[in-house]
Amino acid sequence: NRIWVHNVAEVMGTPLTDPATVAPVMEFATEMGMVPVEIKKEKAGYLMNSLLMPLLGAASNLLVAGIAEPADIVKVWRISMGAPRGPFELFDMIGLMTPYNIGINGPNPEFARYLKEHYIDKGKLGMSTGEGFYKYPKP
């Protein structure tokens, strides 16, 4: 995650947060070179993950259902959206243990089992190990 390039700072309080603290936090984020965005209500996953999770879920469902291969799903996403990375590149960046742990007892156990069989059991955990859906330079 290249925070110095993709420099959004999501600022979210809780019902117990003094509203007077939001402005100084937003200002501090700006001083650090971030682009602050205030989230008005408490939301698990904030904004970015709330937008990202449906994409990753759709991509994993397309793969598990045998509809398309990761490279083709990524190609469609990157070309159509002008995005620098596709969903399976994002999975590799996040690390495959994270979607496995989220999915195995949650919303997507089929994908979690797929990850375990095809990648995790083979030591392919994503960028951190040099290979996941894609191969990377030695970590």
Regions found by a protein language model. Name each.
Residues 16-26, 30-43, 60, 64-139:
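NAD(P)-dependent Rossmann-like dehydrogenase/reductase catalytic/cofactor-binding core
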Residues 2-12:
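Acidic/polar active-site rim loop that often engages polyanionic ligands
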Residues 2, 44-46:
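A short acidic, often aromatic-flanked loop/helix-cap motif at beta-alpha or helix-coil junctions
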Residues 11-15, 54-57:
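Short, hinge-like loop/turn segments at secondary-structure boundaries
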